[in-house]
Amino acid sequence: MGFLKKLFGNIEKANKGEISTEEIVPPFTVDLVEEADDYWRQMEENLLINAVKAVGGPEAVERAFVLTNFKKNQETFELFYQMDGQLLSWREMDASVVDKISNQLLPQAAEVARAVNENYEEANVPVIQYAMLQFETATMAWFGRKHTTASPEAKLTFEELVSGWRAILEKEVPNRPLDSDRPFPYYEV
């Protein structure tokens, strides 16, 4: 992605006469950190899409919140949904949703963590321990924050992160318009 961005930027510069045509094609370099981040952004979006599909699609929920735990041998997801102005855990939903999340989404956690973090390992940067993702159906906006092994939040247990963020979400949900198009606060230490 970085290469194409540079290429198109250079084409614009050449069209304006700012650089010569010989300088249009940038040197091709592989930025492993950028590639890892790009892959993570794709995975964030896929996780949110699957979380929303699991409950019946965007018409079934107002917002979806996904927490990931990518710590070795602890990989899992925690999901919350805003429905009719109320924040619900996926465990509080009807049996078909609980079954779908338990049997289809949660078993993917270890593979998702491995796929994402092997890219960061290859780039020789801190790997993701936790992430907090949010999706707003009214605007189709999504947001995410990752916590790597270098983040102070990595020292938290997953339960501490889940309960801390849920407390923030429960406080924010009643006061946030459905089309706010901005992220809820994240839990931080």
Regions flagged by a language model, labelled:
Residues N10, A14-G17, N46, N50, ...:
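Surface-exposed polar/charged interaction patches
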